[in-house]
């Protein structure tokens, strides 16, 4: 084989906080094993593409009118208990505006999973050049689409919400429902990954792979109900989990420029395809 696409990993951000050894051994240890094999055996591998994650950015990039671009480390319990869920400027404590997170943004993983994904990328970019193998890493946003598990809660809110809706159960949304993510459809991810293998200039690069658009969680819930034609109670609970990020969406201009990547599926189009697939499954 000429290339390795290294996607294998445990993926539960929350779960990683109480199964630390499992996530470190599987994600970092698995990458180390792959690199050991590439270093110490004969093979024909010319390029390794490793999956990093948006999780390495933590809260991501914001702009403060007084302090410029800033990278909040996280939110505090006191603010969230009062229903104030937005990030604050880490320098002046003032309000900040969300902006797209670029690849050169500060790295602030807020979970063991995020740290493990960061290390996976660092290992690949460190070792591969020393053995004559090219390296590329992709920081995927929230990937979804046909084929994802509907029974594993760690595959994301689309699976969780879909299963509840199809079974006639209500949806409980944390915080105020305005928290956002960048949802990218699997077909676009496949296209990007192929480009990551084929484009020569991608060697040694790190790319954000998403849509560059933020969608809030309440919109996700309402859109799923609409697509399935099933109305269930959608409750904004105000509950929260420390360590969850508020917002994050990708700046994909580098992937556009170097890879020629352009996402084809809007959130609405991708969700429609996803729901058609779910309708054929057993919820």
Where are the regions a protein language model picked out?
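Short beta-strand segments
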Residues: 49-52, 137-145, 175, 206-211
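Hydrophobic alpha-helix immediately C-terminal to the catalytic Tyr-X-X-X-Lys motif of short-chain
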Residues: 119, 123-127, 157, 161, ...
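C-terminal substrate-binding subdomain of Rossmann-fold SDR/epimerase-dehydratase oxidoreductases
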Residues: 165-283
């Amino acid at each position: 084989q000429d290339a390795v696409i290294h996607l294998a990993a445990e993926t539960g951000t929350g779960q990683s906080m109480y199964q630390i050894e499992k996530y470190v051994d599987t994600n970092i240890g698995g990458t180390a094993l792959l690199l050991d094999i590439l270093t110490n055996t004969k093979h024909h591998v010319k390029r390794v593409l490793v999956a990093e994650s948006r999780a390495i950015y933590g809260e991501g990039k914001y702009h403060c009118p007084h302090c410029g671009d800033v990278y909040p480390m996280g939110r505090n319990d006191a603010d969230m208990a009062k229903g104030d869920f937005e990030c604050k400027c880490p320098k002046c404590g003032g309000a900040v505006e969300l902006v797209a997170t670029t690849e050169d943004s500060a790295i602030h993983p807020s979970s063991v999973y995020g740290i493990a994904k960061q290390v996976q990328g660092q290992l690949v970019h460190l070792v591969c050049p020393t053995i004559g193998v090219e390296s590329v890493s992709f920081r995927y946003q929230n990937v979804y689409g046909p084929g994802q598990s509907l029974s594993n809660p760690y595959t994301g809110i689309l699976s969780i919400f879909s299963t509840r809706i199809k079974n006639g159960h209500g949806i409980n949304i944390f915080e105020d429902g305005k928290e956002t993510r960048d949802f990218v459809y699997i077909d676009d991810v496949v296209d990007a990954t192929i480009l990551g293998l084929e484009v020569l200039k991608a060697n040694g690069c790190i790319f954000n792979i998403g849509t560059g658009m933020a969608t809030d969680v309440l919109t996700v819930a309402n859109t799923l109900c609409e697509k399935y034609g099933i109305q269930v109670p959608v409750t904004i609970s105000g509950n929260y989990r420390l360590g969850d990020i508020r917002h994050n969406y990708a700046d994909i201009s580098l992937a556009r420029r170097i890879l020629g990547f352009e996402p084809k599926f809007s959130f609405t189009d991708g969700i429609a395809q996803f729901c058609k697939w779910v309708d054929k499954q057993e919820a």
